Amino acid sequence: MLAANDYRGGLGVSLFRRCSIGILLLTCLVTGPAYAELMTLKKRQQLDLSQYSVTNPEASYFDVATRKALLASTDNSLLLQSIDNLSGGMSCRQLLEIPPITNRLRIPGFYPDPQAWRQASQPLFQFEDSVSNLAGAFVATDDDYYAQCLGRFLDQWASQDALVHFHYSPSDRQAWYATESMIFAAAMAYSIVRPELEDQPEQRERIEDWFSRLAYRHAYVPNQTKESCCNNHFYRRALYATMIGVLTEDNELFRYGVGAVYSALNEMTQQGGLPRELARGRRAVHYQNYALMYLVTNMQIISRQGYDIFHLKVDGHTIKDAVDFLLDAIEDASILGENIPREQYHGFLRDNQYSSWMEIYQQHFSDPRIAEFLITQRPIYNRSAGGYVTLFFMDPTVQKYRRPKTEDEEKQQLSVYGKESSPL
């Protein structure tokens, strides 16, 4: 069995060294007015995050007890529908029959062959849905059965060292990418039920040791490419690092997650763009949103440890600048600059899992454009980055009923956002 310390040696410095490779190349790809300089190795190494430490290992990414109490007395039809859907019952015995992934995982790339990618990814999606559904059912019903089942399910995977082995090379990274979301899906779901497993100390120890080994094993992959080391995949790794750091009271992991927020704010353009995401051409807006999905969710975990991270200002920038830039760019792609195509891919706006972060964001800021957009998106579920976010976060007073888009709204969205495109 691999020990967590096997992957700790020089974690921060080694990862930041890889992140520095290719900075000049990327800067050339994304040029134009008001673009920030990408964070250098030296600057990353100089980040002092010693003021950040885990203060409450029992804190999930939302106040579970308070939310369960609210749901128990709500008359909100939208929330009641979600509660009813999750109360149908899941068989723990059937879930425990799902075989843990213990082989050296290998997944084909999405863009070369989407069909092969989807087929190979089904067991991974099944895992993410399983942990998120159990956590959601526990919150919806307050039935300890689901918490205990999630503990047994994760313990089974932990006991067999699942997900530790995966194929990776600089030219074949998909298995590494895929396990990112499996790790944070499991850690976030577990954080919801962890207090219910207090009478299972050995089980908790096995699960948390497994999480720690996965985090260090995964984050310390050698020969990371210039694209993967520091862009949205860095933010995805930061998400599980922060959550597992909390669960295991590991300040090194926790600060790794915090460091991703500092990195994003530091690199932000004057207008609020994330240069590494804007380098994606026709998918620049999509990847700005994609990055925010993990940054905002990560920030929510950090905020639950008592830090006002949503108002953190680095070089004059806050996360609100990135959100405002996204919303502006959706409406008018010309703000992206001369070197980025105005014909932007907007298919993500029709898939509500990509708006999961907005439900969290609205708890900290009340953005009218987001509020209007969410009305036709709810209820929102993201199988890995937050689960049933509408059930967990929505203020019951803002929307009482599910409201699909009208025909006129569909036409208006198409006129503003453009026709949905297939992934390039």
Language model regions located:
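Bacterial N-terminal signal peptides that target proteins for export
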Residues: 5-23
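Bacterial N-terminal signal peptides
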Residues: 22-30
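Extracellular glycan-targeting catalytic surfaces
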Residues: 36-224, 303, 311-424
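Alpha-solenoid repeat scaffolds
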Residues: 164, 251, 267-271, 309, ...
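Active-site cradle of extracellular carbohydrate-active enzymes
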Residues: 176-289
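A beta-strand-loop signature enriched in Asp, Gly, Thr, and Trp
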Residues: 269-285, 301-319
